[in-house]
């Protein structure tokens, strides 16, 4: 299971609206991608997954694995 936690970022001006919404959802703590998307009503699943992966690649959020 992979959960994501938010990281400090200075990329606010270049984030999309969806990325900001995802980053704000993670203020409560690490969540799985499906839980993040569930907390964003009306959001397209595939668009949100793309944004989550893009944010992880950019370092805005950090993947945490349960090993």
Predicted segments with their positions:
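A short, conserved structural fragment
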Residues: 56-67
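Short helix-coil junctions and helix-kink-helix linkers
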Residues: 34-46
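Short capping segments at the starts of secondary-structure elements
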Residues: 25-35
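The DNA-recognition helices of helix-turn-helix-type DNA-binding domains
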Residues: 29, 43, 55
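Short alpha-helical segments that sit at the start of domains
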Residues: 1-22, 47-50, 54
């Amino acid at each position: 299971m992979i959960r994501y936690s938010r990281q400090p970022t200075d990329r606010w001006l270049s984030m999309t609206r969806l990325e900001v919404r995802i980053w704000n959802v993670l203020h409560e703590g690490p969540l799985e991608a499906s839980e993040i998307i569930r907390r964003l009503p009306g959001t397209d699943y595939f668009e949100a997954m793309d944004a989550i992966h893009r944010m992880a690649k950019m370092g805005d959020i950090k993947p945490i694995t349960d090993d």
